[in-house]
Amino acid sequence: MNAVTLAPGSESDVREILLSETEQLHIAGGQSRLVATEKKIISTSQLNGIIEYEPGALTMVAKAGTPLSVIKDALQKENQQLAFEPPEMKHLLRLPGNSTIGGVFSTNASGSRRIQVGAARDHLLGVRFVDGSGRVLKNGGRVMKNVTGYDLVKLMAGSWGTLGVITEVSFKVLPIAETQATLRINSCQASILTQAINTPYDVSGTFYDVGLKLAYIRIEGFDKSVKYRVEQLLREFSDFEVDILEMEESKKFWQNMSDLKFLKEIKGDLWRVSVKPTDGSKIIKILDPKISFLDWCGGLVWLGVDQGFDVREKMKKVAGHAMCLLGNFDQFHPSSTLEKRLSNSIRNKFDPKMLFNQEILN
């Protein structure tokens, strides 16, 4: 890939570029997620730094190109976290870049705790961005009750850089739980994830290894509460062989999940499929993949299949979105006619020159 990269150092620089540019562009953060392009790249890597952090208010404001690792380090010092556990793709995709906080929200990157606290977009409070006409727009605020521009904030989360160049984000953070434990349930079916999430014991993570028939159920909170809920879940699953991963072992396991290390052994093509939680097992039965895992209580399916196996063609009868991460298929799931119409309507308002990330929209 021999694309020219522009790295503006300020929001004003971004605006100047967009006012004068007529050729299609690709917006990138730390380039830690795989999107093939030969277009000129606008990198936000120089829009870097934490602008404001109020631990007591559970909010942070940062420039979009701030590395995710810098955000995490600052939060760790105050025993706080990005509760939605944004996953790191760079190790899996063997890319040199580092995830940025703007990239996290632009791709709505959300980890296992999504089932408890929501996705990345649910933690985004406000956003500044420059649209395709060179307008600097700001929506949302730094506190949850400020809902000015609420819909646009949510729209930018998960837009993959198709509506504008995000320059600044404000978001909520949460305290790190006092302790955690994970139940590892042996020789079980995937339906046990739903059984666990439907208990009153506030499960914060579920994961299922289809090949090994192993389920992992995470509990977090205050020490006494975690011990009580673990005891109750042991009773709930008394018909199964259950091991307990105590705090450090549990933390290590879920960190490996966030780093996607469980996918490193996959040979062939790698797919990430989002469906209704009740359809996760159905996808496995239809596709019969070589390797598969379930997250989000079955709503997120990771698939390792033979090279050239068309997952989208096989899953046509199941509503969902299949992204090809490693393979020779288009990375993004094709949009329906209605989705394209709605997307184009929104896009015309923010990018009338059709500058941004065309390879994603197409």
Regions found by a protein language model. Give the residues of each.
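FAD-binding subdomain of flavoenzyme oxidoreductases
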Residues: 84-85, 94-206
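Glycine-rich N-terminal segment of FAD-binding domains in flavoprotein oxidoreductases
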Residues: 2-89, 309
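Conserved glycine-rich FAD pyrophosphate-binding loop
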Residues: 92, 240-362
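General beta-strand structural signal in soluble alpha/beta enzymes
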Residues: 5-8, 24-29, 42-43, 62-64, ...
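Short, conserved charged micro-motifs
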Residues: 69-70, 189-194, 224-232, 279-287, ...
